[in-house]
């Protein structure tokens, strides 16, 4: 109890330093939304949407919520998701010079393969500039006035700013801070932020798909103790292997240690558990449509049962 009270006081300090009060809220007109993560299992969901009829699903009140680099994929322009969210600082913290030349990013100096990552980030923003349908874009208030957000001057995109200040303390305190939009649960993964913001936006049912989260079985440690992670996404034919590196305090290149990696994964799933708790508190449904996967915080539903709720296209 004393620990929770201390965390409540500590969180108040964080809120005063990092959060903005009275951010404009957004209320979604739809009842149900599907958050489409980038895991391989999302392919089955997207293909089924195409066969049932994307516009048919939308007419029946279903909305789509995309994340991160989804706009780089052809499916983006067929699904035309109404909602989009980014959270990771790498999507926001770069200059005009880096946008024009990805190789100039400071991280690329110690992680040469980051140039490819930055190039894809740039392509993500360029694709968003081509959006010709109404879109609600959720952006952390910390980055609302950064270069790249200001660059995105597409009149079809409405920005909704949210506070990403991790809330700790007693359950009652956390609930009140969430209600007042002063912070959120730990969102080590962008999907958790989507779920949370969707609930705050009034959605009654939040479905998630493509949340494979099999990071822990896709790593190996090579002969010099470098962790190699294999990444797989629904839009890639080949899995990508890359070393997990970091920049040390002295500017040199270091290796991410195994305990650091698993500590991050613990935060991912702890965050999901907290979001699940809050969803129950405010009587919202969060349902996992991912076939397989390693997220155990939410109830599950098969794709067959999910699509069975909707009438088929004529």
Specify the residue positions occupied by each region the protein language model found:
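Metal-ion/cofactor- or nucleotide/acyl-coenzyme-handling active-site neighborhoods
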Residues: 1-314
